[in-house]
Amino acid sequence: MGVSGKYENASFDMEDGAELVFGRSPQEANIVFDQVHADVSRKHCSVRFDGRNNQYIVTDFSATGTYTDGGVRLEKNQPKQLSRGTVIYLGGSKQNAFRLN
């Protein structure tokens, strides 16, 4: 669910194995941000739900980073397992945030 930014209060239903890609490029992302969101890369990150383990797999592809609510920057191109309820931020600000429900 969107916590802040363009997609605040938006909900994205994800079945097991489903993947969302966040970014500014409609060719590379299915959750698309306007060009004014300079801290969001063309292909910023992907989020996949792993129903078997009841977790999300988040992979950062960006120049500006994807962060968890603890302020930890995810390592670029390295899938990271995150628990339900974790909040992720696209870019260095908390302008675009999503809770992994």
Where are the predicted features?
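Intrinsically disordered, low-complexity acidic Ser/Thr-rich regulatory segments
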Residues: 1-38, 48-53, 81-82, 87, ...
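Short, solvent-exposed loop/turn segments enriched in Ser/Thr/Gly
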Residues: 40-44
